[in-house]
Amino acid sequence: MNARAAAVAELERRIGYVFTDRDLLERALTHASVGDGARAVRHNERLEFLGDRVLNLCAAERLMALDPDAREGEMSRLLASLVNYHACARAAKRAGLQEALRLSASATKVGARKSDAVLGDACEALIAALYIDGGLETARAFFLKFWDEEFARLDEPRAKDPKTQLQEWVQGMGLPLPTYEIVSQEGPPHAPSFTVEVQVAGFGAERGEGRSRQAAEKAAAQCMLLKREGPEPGKVGE
């Protein structure tokens, strides 16, 4: 048994489920970068689409069961914390999916195996494969097992993110809301790098970088927040 076959076996052991359709499992674990150029390789992108919907269903029904009196807005906020690609990537690592992935040599070289975006997508594809091969109960069992820590994180006190802090600050100053603009987007699709510029009236502009647009916006907002102890609006440069 080679290293990857051992990793796939370990993945199934951790999940507690052995696939009947081995081709389906292989497709769920195959990144779009795989292919020799001579023929199409069935990869996991279509499965991601289905897996995202199954994941949202499992998370939504669990949230409703945990708090029957929760308002829709609060559940939507909690749902967003449970189904983003960072949460999916953490679940993928807990399951041992990282080493079981099929990646091209070039994708492996640039670190795709450690990419939250790649791992998150693969996790959604795996959920879809579990749903197809074993039904909703099998997919739900995976979710409950590997999202347990994510539910624990919901109870942790959370500091406001930089974008929220910046918005509250400018509103308190009576200024227009900050504006964000993508300055550049570089790198391959599985490992992009964004640069975003934020502007606040009277305080100029600041830039931030990140692996996603949202991360870059937060970085830019954090840089702008450092100007709060600077000159008042309209006095910049005086």
Curated annotation (Swiss-Prot):
GO terms for cellular component: cytoplasm. The active site is at 52, 124. Residues 161-230 form the DRBM domain. Its EC number is 3.1.26.3. SUPFAM superfamilies: dsRNA-binding domain-like, RNase III domain-like. It is found in: Cytoplasm. This is Ribonuclease 3. It comes from Phenylobacterium zucineum (strain HLK1).
